[in-house]
Amino acid sequence: MNYTDISHGLGVPFGGFGTGYFVFGRHGFVNFNVDGYPEQQQTAEYPHGTLWDYTAENPSCGPIALYADIDSVRWLLQKDSHPSIEGNPSVFVKNEVKMPYGKTVFLAGDIRIELLMYSSLKRFDLTRTSIPACVIEYTVTNTGCNSHTVSLGLAYDTDKYTAETKNNLLVLNEGNGGMAFGINKTNSQVLSAGETGNYVGAIGWYYPEFVTQGLARDDIILRHNSIKDYKETEHRKGYIRNYTLRYENAADVATDALLHYEEWKDDINAWHGAFSFPDETAKLLFGSYSSVITSSLYTTQGYYFEIEQPHGCLNTMDVSVYSTWLYMMNWPELEEIDLYQYIRTIPMEGETAGKVWHSLWADSAHYVEEAIFVIRVWRYVLWSGNRQILEDAWPVCKAALEYLYSTEGSGALIDNISGNQSYDAWKMPGICNYVNNQWLYALFSFERMSNQLGKEAIVLGKKVSELLPEALKQYNEALWDEKEGYWYAYKVTEKSNRLPFGNAVFSDQLFGFWAASLDPEAYGILSNEQCVRALKKIYVHNRVYVPNGDYYCWLNGALPEKEKTPSIEMNDGIYEHCGYHALCCWICAETGMASLMYRFGLPQTGEDVFYNVAKGIGNNHLAAGEYNRGVDENMKPETLRYEPGKDTPRFPAYPRYKCAWEHPIAILNLQADLDNIYLNPAKNVNIALSEIRMGSDVFSVTVEKNWDTCLVGGIEAKPVLKRNEGKHTVEFIKTK
């Protein structure tokens, strides 16, 4: 994977998992979020304001600036003057990224300064991935004809910090924490004409406390059902960041970075080397790490929060079901931590017993999260082989399904009045495809869990073995269009609101299957023929060409008479235009569709969808939005008119984008039960993945395009790996 030019944007975020961060690029330091809860002002203003604008020309400067003293002149390494720090602006040349590396080049007179910056990242090692530091490797070249004296350092806002020097480090203190900067050459260096000098510096920071937005308090999270007794005024203590378990101050962090930066580079290079993908795929996958840096908060208690930027919601269920794929592939314990956060906080008594939070302790949705939670638990059990979480989660899953069915059940399906689900402004009242597809696979997943535990799967007195077939029958009767070959978005009922356009072609109509697709038995619920027909219909019918970018995107919904699709929007307010989100292209629905194409034997189509998503995001892969365009009243592509801050580019990146890490799993057609792992890769692409960890099972796999033979441990064999037998090497090779 090569570096990508992002000179048009604000720059690259630096920091670790849950450490806070800053961005560095053409404007120097911006989006300074090392302290507290990140992007509070942006969240408070949303959907108004422009703080999300990744291409802004006049962002607020951070309180520090890198400088180069050349002879007697101070140059700040940023393209504009700083309002609080003296120095001449430099000439910005370019900014490139290969996450988590960022390269920025400036000219300060005759001196060319290239900065290679990065923070620590180590796959499968959260401790090494949560260090609040940034290394800066300087390559300084005298491009002039005369010698120059060069000195490098960090300048700061004197109104914000008090400074002292300790062990050759500049230490900047303020009331709630501080920063430290060190460099390996503290004396001025003389560079002759044409000479290059190399330096290594590091910035460390230390801000121990943060307070989240909403009701997320550590004295709630570990007390089952205590939410009913919540009093906000009693729970305003902050959390302590996890990195305080290892460091006492910012100077300790900066010193650690200067001592171990070469190891950090080795770890990063090993991460890159563990995967071999086509460049566009690699760019998306590694680029989505931007969202890890900008969205995570990690506590000393070991649990964490992921912010649904720009909303401030924490660990949002219908976001995490997507975004957690990055964690499952690199730090899989994080998915277990998050699921236990829900297991411990979902009420288990009273009227709301089993109600699953939309996001932790706040913003409960009407009826969309319970089924997602059940599928997500089973998916992680299959991934990890962890039977303990299966036992711990089972009663909560049962309660969740019973809550959903008792409040919204109708016949064997789910019937909701308003249809308020994950597609927000596009309400789908009555029998909603999105929710009922989940419902089918949640019932399936619960029965699979129950069988493993030797329990009978019963929901409100009904055996799931009888409820699921009836639900499947009613689902097809209500929503399947045999002539056109797809399931309707929704069907209104006597109970529900009477919104029109239920026969829209909904791009995410197989979301429940996508979430359950690790399980080989999931492929027998809906018929493969129906699924293939539906995917082909969506691919052709919902596709929109974006000439300014030369790529395709896929609408969330399109009417059978496609040209009439804009009529789905029914203006009923300034912000939530009813139906508007049908006219938008949701990145995760698109990537999910690409994966489903692979799952159902349509690899060329799947790769085409994923390629177009990647092309649409382009060099904004650090700033992917929730969407990548919508359409206007004439079906012409446009930036989202009501929510430009959710379109691409927007910063910080929207967390669902991390689901790109599920794409290689779909290419491998990886499936698993608790006895075996099954592989049957597509034959249209060369890929390699080293050390996929699924609990105690670890395997590496390489796939050669048009393969015809499978080797397991160097011996020709079926691609079936017995679980709990350690490490495996699997090769799919072409011999003919």
Model-predicted regions and their roles:
Residues 18, 29-31, 37-41, 50-51, ...:
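Non-catalytic C-terminal accessory modules of carbohydrate-active enzymes
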Residues 36-105, 333-422, 547-569, 609-651:
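Helix-terminus loop motifs that line ligand-binding clefts
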Residues 316-347, 370, 395, 402, ...:
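Active-site core of glycosidic bond-cleaving carbohydrate-active enzymes
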